[in-house]
């Protein structure tokens, strides 16, 4: 039986690097992987998955209205897919996560999703919430806070390094916009003096 996997972490934990390594492992054994990433995350260019250490691979892009199962079936019809790998899975909709579960259940293709668990305010992303609810296997990828503790949260900052406490849930950025922290230091950073 194929499974739906969700590997989550805070920013800068190496999620994309791990995805690209897993894809390489499949390909090295003569297997075909299908890579997907969110259209709105174009930090390394649209239609690419890239890591901070310089690894890159082409990927199909999805948006909120992409029919994931139809895209995967079409790709599978052209060349049998041995594993589907989704980067930036936090940007999936609830409906799209259910579709990915059907790919695993009906097509018997493993689906590996990688993404953030929570946003800069500590709220679950919709895609992550559904993955946490229905994935067969859930894995935490660890990174560290500046204090050495496990980082589980992220803060958003402006160009001057000032922590932003309110705003849209989705704003694309990398190391210049987001910092991974342990919960204690996240709470301290988010405290506006009233806490």
Where are the predicted features?
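Catalytic-core regions built around general acid/base machinery
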Residues: 22, 99-107, 130-134
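Conserved AAA+ ATPase core "coupling" helix
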Residues: 136, 142-163
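Conserved ATPase-coupling elements of RecA-like P-loop NTPase cores
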Residues: 89-100, 120-125
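Walker B catalytic acidic pair
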Residues: 87-89, 115-116
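Sensor-1/coupling segment of RecA-like P-loop NTPase cores
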Residues: 104-126
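Conserved P-loop
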Residues: 1-75, 119-130, 140-143, 163-165, ...
């Amino acid at each position: 039986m194929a499974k739906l996997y969700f590997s989550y972490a805070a920013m800068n934990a190496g999620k994309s690097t791990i995805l690209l390594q897993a894809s390489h492992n499949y390909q090295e054994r003569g297997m075909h992987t299908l890579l997907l990433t969110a259209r709105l995350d174009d930090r390394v260019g649209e239609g690419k998955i890239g890591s901070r250490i310089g690894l890159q691979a082409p990927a199909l892009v999805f948006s909120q209205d992409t029919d994931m199962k139809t895209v995967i079936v079409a790709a599978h019809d052209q060349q049998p897919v041995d594993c589907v790998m989704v980067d930036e899975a936090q940007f999936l909709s609830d409906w799209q996560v259910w579709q990915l579960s059907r790919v695993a259940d009906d097509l018997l293709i493993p689906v590996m999703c990688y993404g953030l668990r929570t946003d800069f305010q500590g709220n679950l992303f919709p895609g992550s919430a559904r993955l946490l609810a229905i994935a067969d296997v859930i894995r935490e990828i660890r990174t560290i806070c500046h204090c050495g503790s496990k980082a589980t949260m992220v803060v958003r900052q402006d160009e001057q390094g000032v922590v932003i406490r309110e705003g849209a849930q989705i704003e694309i950025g990398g190391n210049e916009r987001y910092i991974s922290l342990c919960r204690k230091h996240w709470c301290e950073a988010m405290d506006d003096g009233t806490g």
